[in-house]
Amino acid sequence: MASEFRPPLHFVLFPFMAQGHMIPMVDIARLLAQRGVTITIVTTPQNAGRFKNVLSRAIQSGLPINLVQVKFPSQESGSPEGQENLDLLDSLGASLTFFKAFSLLEEPVEKLLKEIQPRPNCIIADMCLPYTNRIAKNLGIPKIIFHGMCCFNLLCTHIMHQNHEFLETIESDKEYFPIPNFPDRVEFTKSQLPMVLVAGDWKDFLDGMTEGDNTSYGVIVNTFEELEPAYVRDYKKVKAGKIWSIGPVSLCNKLGEDQAERGNKADIDQDECIKWLDSKEEGSVLYVCLGSICNLPLSQLKELGLGLEESQRPFIWVIRGWEKYNELLEWISESGYKERIKERGLLITGWSPQMLILTHPAVGGFLTHCGWNSTLEGITSGVPLLTWPLFGDQFCNEKLAVQILKAGVRAGVEESMRWGEEEKIGVLVDKEGVKKAVEELMGDSNDAKERRKRVKELGELAHKAVEEGGSSHSNITFLLQDIMQLEQPKK
């Protein structure tokens, strides 16, 4: 451990203010603190509150973690007061203003880092915070990028950036094409790779992210080498070996309270949820959660609900706590849906204790938006996936889960949900399509049995990776040794 030989290392962590980014960064903070690293997490007051309980327990247990709050620049950026997290925005169409607001934190954060003691040895910053590039350079502190994505997606994005001219020759957004120089033959449409072809202000922001990636000292990835060995190997070549795969970071949550409150306090009583699951047969329940920023239109959500009903299988459906989904809740109540499914359907409005649910023996499938955290948590729990990607890296994650890992079934979504244009897209999978996909995942066919066996094996590999001597545990050691070596010439 680093602290056994010299004053402990001090890492400053900058999570991006979206649940899918903050949750693994807080896990990383605890993993590093467990190895003797002093940790400072920099975030805004509203976001600090979401992790208050989890971090308080960590600090009380003796982990050297400090939480420093900086004011979110609402007024200066033209953002509404109180919207300090991506999941609080009234519309995802306003997300660019939110992303760009963080550049206004550069001056106060640089001042903070100049004054903080002990002097930081390393910055770990989310890829969506390119303003930290300049701070790290000005202060001479090595900066490591945290990518909340898998190496499959990172390699794919890197290759397609290099083949930009090839992409421009493809006229249709619906035409499938193979990724060149990829370990496996995988095909996408242009609309499924939204971070590659952008224009205007979004391009400027993404160019800043790319520059930050290219100039960083290295990259931390929430994956494990045994899950995607060819993609970890090839992405390491791209980054000259400075890649540390340290996942699944969610497995640092060993206490029931930490699992239940990971990311936010759950909006359902933990005991009530477990009691409901205990009443169901092993492997019979489908868990349905489309992430913290699900942007499906009402028409599609209705079809999803009706398909779940017609599947005749028990399910837990997590419904996003956005104000816009009040219409969905009205439909659930007024159409008689809630009454019809009350014996075998559990509805959770808001935040769910996802880790507790996925690890329960009654859960036999996970209908997911394919955010990387959820994809990895499902696999880590040994639960087969029903994939419903929405945007961003999620189509890449679907390809990895279904085509490469053989750990899931596609719902049949072909088109990305463009932020601010969701209503134009409408219904992509009708209730019959939902019912059919659920049956394929949860049924007793030979393919379904083989899939369950395969994902269980992957889950076992995930747990071994984070144990002492495992690949991810060792990679944390290698990371700390690397940063310590950088400090030696300064002695």
Curated annotation (Swiss-Prot):
Which GO terms label this protein's molecular function in UniProt?
cis-zeatin O-beta-D-glucosyltransferase activity; trans-zeatin O-beta-D-glucosyltransferase activity; UDP-glucosyltransferase activity
Does this UniProt record's set of keywords contain Cytoplasm? no
EC numbers on record: 2.4.1.-
A Pfam family matched in the record: UDPGT
* Residues that, per the record, bind UDP-alpha-D-glucose: 292, 352-354, 369-377, 391-394
Give one GO biological process term: response to toxic substance
Which CDD domains does the record match to this protein?
GT1_Gtf-like
Please state, per the UniProt record, what induces or represses the expression of this protein. Not induced by cytokinin treatment.
Which SUPFAM superfamilies is this protein grouped with? UDP-Glycosyltransferase/glycogen phosphorylase
UniProt keywords (A-Z) are:
Detoxification, Glycosyltransferase, Transferase
InterPro entries of this UniProt entry? UDP_glucos_trans, UDP_glycos_trans_CS
UniProt lists the family membership as follows: Belongs to the UDP-glycosyltransferase family.
Relate the protein's function as given in its record: Involved in the O-glucosylation of trans-zeatin and dihydrozeatin. Also active in vitro on cis-zeatin, dihydrozeatin-9-N-Glc, and olomoucine. Can detoxify the explosive 2,4,6-trinitrotoluene in plant by forming O- or C-glucose conjugates.
Q: What is this protein called?
A: UDP-glycosyltransferase 73C1
Give the organism the record lists: Arabidopsis thaliana
From the UniProt record, report the name of the gene that encodes this protein: UGT73C1
